[in-house]
Amino acid sequence: MGQKVHPYSLRIKINRDWKSKWYFDKKLYSEILHEDFLIRRETMKFLKGIKFDISDIEIIRNNLQRVTVVISTPRPGSVIGVKGANLEKIGQLLTRKVSKKINIKIKEIKKPEFDAQIVANGIAKQLENRASYRKLLKSSLLSSISKGIQGIKIKVSGRLGGAEIARSFEVKEGRIPLHTLRANIDYGFAEAYTTYGVIGVKVWLFKGEILGKQINSDAGQVINRKPSKDKVERFDKGKIDDKGRKVVNDDKFSREKLEIGSRSKNDFKNKNDSDI
């Protein structure tokens, strides 16, 4: 069966950037990577506990003792809390986990319907509230298309509707060009914990092409270019002699060379006839 590569990893440094930005000695790589995992896990656990939508967590390190955590959310005021109470709690929690100074920043998502992770989180929450998955997916699809999304695909997998056998259900509208690297594809994944088991939710959004087609507008012109009639006629008249042989340089020296070659062949033929 065909498998799909993650749209982010395929487009790194084309129209996507790394979610962890740091560079240290390779001996420290595993330790810092584990710290990044702890920071993301504890932050998501805390914010999900107070029921806030989080799209992404970006980690930036300039030195070993200071970590900057950027949280993307459509409701920054709620995440910050009253006088920054929630940020202070998150900072204290992460400091205990990684024993480093934590600087937390909030990034607002102005258009939540254009964020695949936010859409996936919303669908997962409604599935946990026993909403009909068919109506839910179709309504989410229509609402995203009405906002200006060029393409959307939603797929849910698991024991849908309490069925004994797990299956998948998918809806799609518009274009999702996964093989086009210049396409701005947003991807989100969430899990709905129902009484029948876990249901996975995947969302793909196509927001348009970031790199214009005019950049590669001349691609293929050399292959598809056909010689003009003037060039063909000039080649036929000037580059082929009377006996159908190609002339590399149409000058006096070349013509004399061809005439000498033809005379030598005729002399050799006449000599063989006389010997017979």
From Swiss-Prot:
PROSITE patterns referenced in this protein's UniProt entry, alphabetically: KH_TYPE_2, RIBOSOMAL_S3
Keywords carried by this UniProt record: Ribonucleoprotein, Ribosomal protein, RNA-binding, rRNA-binding
InterPro entries, alphabetized: KH_dom, KH_dom-like_a/b, KH_dom_type_2, KH_sf_prok-type, Ribosomal_S3_C_sf, Ribosomal_uS3_bac-typ, Ribosomal_uS3_C, Ribosomal_uS3_CS
Domain KH type-2 positions: 39-110
Intrachain S-S bonds: none
Any matching Pfam family: KH_2
GO molecular function, a single term: mRNA binding
Free-text function comment from the UniProt entry: Binds the lower part of the 30S subunit head. Binds mRNA in the 70S ribosome, positioning it for translation.
Sequence similarity: Belongs to the universal ribosomal protein uS3 family.
Oligomeric and partner information: Part of the 30S ribosomal subunit. Forms a tight complex with proteins S10 and S14.
Protein name as annotated: Small ribosomal subunit protein uS3
Annotated organism of origin: Borrelia duttonii (strain Ly)
